[in-house]
Structures are given as structure tokens and as C-alpha cells.
């Protein structure tokens, strides 16, 4: 049956070859069968600018380029790869999506988000997010030498890890009230997002109507894909390959 695939939170980087291998397997064996592929943020562990053309980054860009030649491929930036820009889109052939975006998925309106904006109890991250999403801040960051951007990215990741270790389970998750607010505002019955690394299908009720929130999984222990079929059925699928 015709279907569309959704992935997020691969956190690709050179020092995790297992994740890269799972992504390349996904491109070869799963993506070619889909109508379209949506990547909902944190595809890279860190992205410091489209001008950072390392051998590893070029390898991933070329793999996306091969995919996008034959399949519509959509890319939403996350909190780890928010500096991805139009040059990256031109090099890969992907179409960039704003966060949030409402798409028509087999004639059904579906809200797509990365998901970090839903975690409103994490006040420190929300303050950080408001800063880094300002165009002038991004322009300033991209004007810095690559060597300095690498150091800053490393510093930000270390700070993020330390911060996350101090948070409770509830604070690191989405806020139900914010989910309800956003879904009401966008007038949708289905929300798909990543970020929290807690793959699940949540049944909700909004304005008396049954709704669903699908959370995509991270790729630290294998591949994680949402398969959404033309008839409205869907499944979160995990897979592992022998390395």
C-alpha cells in the first residue's frame, strides 16, 4: 500500500558510525518504497553552517541528494541543526519545512513539529530557543570562523547534557496543555513530532474529538520510523541491522 515515512532525531555525527549505517540501510531498503520522506529535526548531532563541508557531511549530503532525486524529501530543522539553510537544501534537493507546518497527508491535515517548543516546563531551553531562532543571532553565528563555531557547538552540547541530567522526567517531556493549545490553534486531529526520544502513540481528546499525538523515536540503538499508509493506518517501526 502507498505510504509515507517520517524520521527524526538521528543525531548523525562521524563518531557514531552505527547510526550512519542504519540511515544508509533505511535509504536503500525502506525509503525507495515510500511516496515521500519527512525528516523532523535533529538529523545531525550538530550543524554549524552549510559551509562546513567535512568529508562526513558531504557523504550525508550526497546520500540525501540521491534520495531526493527520486522521492520528495522534506526537512524540518531541530534544535541541534537549526543552522541548516538554503544552501543545504540546494545541495541535497530537500524541501525545507518551517516548524510548525501543517501538511495534507492523503487528504488529512497533519501538524508536524520538531517538538522542543512543546516542552514548555523546560524554561532554560525555551529561553535558549527564543534566542537561537532569531534571524540576526543566526546570521551572527554564521559570520564567525568555522573553528570558533566548532568550539561553540561543543560547548553548547556539553551544557545541554549537563542541563538535561538535572531535569525530571516530566520537565523533559511535552506539556499536555501546550499540545492541546497548538492542536486547537492549527485545527488538526493528528500531531507528529520528535525531540523527546520517547516513541509512542498517544490518544487524546480535544474539544470532544478524538485526536492522536505520534512521537518519533531516536536512533541511538537502531532505526526508528513512522510508516503512515494511504488508508490512514500507521505504525512505529524499529529496526536493527548486523554491523
From Swiss-Prot:
GO terms for biological process: lipid A biosynthetic process. GO terms for cellular component: cytoplasm; extrinsic component of plasma membrane. Its EC number is 3.6.1.54. It is a peripheral membrane protein. Its cofactor is Mn(2+). InterPro entries: Calcineurin-like_PHP_ApaH (IPR004843), LpxH-like (IPR043461), Metallo-depent_PP-like (IPR029052), UDP-diacylglucosamine_Hdrlase (IPR010138). Its main location: membrane. Pathway: Glycolipid biosynthesis; lipid IV(A) biosynthesis; lipid IV(A) from (3R)-3-hydroxytetradecanoyl-[acyl-carrier-protein] and UDP-N-acetyl-alpha-D-glucosamine: step 4/6. GO terms for molecular function: manganese ion binding; UDP-2,3-diacylglucosamine hydrolase activity. Pfam families: Metallophos. It is an enzyme of class 3 (hydrolase). Binds 2 Mn(2+) ions per subunit in a binuclear metal center. CDD domains: MPP_YbbF-LpxH (cd07398). Mn(2+) 1 binds at residues 9, 11, 42, 197. The keyword Cytoplasm does not apply. The keyword ATP-binding does not apply. Keywords: Cell inner membrane, Cell membrane, Hydrolase, Lipid A biosynthesis, Lipid biosynthesis, Lipid metabolism, Manganese, Membrane, Metal-binding. Belongs to the LpxH family. Hydrolyzes the pyrophosphate bond of UDP-2,3-diacylglucosamine to yield 2,3-diacylglucosamine 1-phosphate (lipid X) and UMP by catalyzing the attack of water at the alpha-P atom. Involved in the biosynthesis of lipid A, a phosphorylated glycolipid that anchors the lipopolysaccharide to the outer membrane of the cell. HAMAP family: LpxH (MF_00575). NCBIfam families: lipid_A_lpxH, PRK05340.1. This is UDP-2,3-diacylglucosamine hydrolase. It comes from Coxiella burnetii (strain RSA 493 / Nine Mile phase I).
Amino acid at each position: 500500500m502507498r505510504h509515507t515515512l517520517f524520521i527524526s532525531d538521528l543525531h548523525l555525527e562521524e563518531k557514531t558510525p552505527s547510526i550512519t549505517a542504519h540511515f544508509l540501510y533505511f535509504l536503500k531498503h525502506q525509503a525507495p518504497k515510500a511516496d515521500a520522506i519527512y525528516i523532523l529535526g535533529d538529523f545531525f548531532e550538530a550543524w554549524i553552517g552549510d559551509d562546513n563541508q567535512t568529508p562526513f557531511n558531504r557523504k550525508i549530503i550526497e546520500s540525501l541528494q540521491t534520495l531526493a532525486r527520486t522521492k520528495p524529501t522534506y526537512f524540518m530543522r531541530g534544535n541541534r541543526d537549526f543552522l541548516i539553510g538554503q544552501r543545504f537544501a540546494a545541495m541535497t534537493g530537500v524541501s525545507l519545512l518551517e516548524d510548525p507546518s501543517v501538511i495534507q497527508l492523503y487528504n488529512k491535515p497533519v501538524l508536524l513539529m520538531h517538538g522542543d517548543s512543546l516542552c514548555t516546563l523546560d524554561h532554560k531551553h525555551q529561553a535558549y530557543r527564543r534566542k537561537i531562532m532569531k534571524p540576526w543571532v543566526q546570521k551572527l553565528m554564521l559570520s564567525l570562523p568555522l573553528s570558533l563555531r566548532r568550539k561553540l557547538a561543543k560547548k553548547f552540547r556539553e551544557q545541554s547534557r549537563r542541563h538535561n541530567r538535572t531535569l525530571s522526567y516530566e520537565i523533559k517531556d511535552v506539556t499536555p496543555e501546550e499540545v492541546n493549545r497548538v492542536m486547537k490553534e492549527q485545527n488538526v486531529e493528528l500531531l507528529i513530532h520528535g525531540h523527546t526520544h520517547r516513541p509512542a502513540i498517544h490518544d487524546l481528546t480535544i474539544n470532544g474529538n478524538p485526536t492522536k499525538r505520534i512521537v518519533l523515536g531516536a536512533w541511538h540503538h537502531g532505526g526508528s520510523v513512522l510508516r503512515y499508509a494511504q488508508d490512514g493506518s500507521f505504525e512505529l517501526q524499529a529496526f536493527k541491522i548486523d554491523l
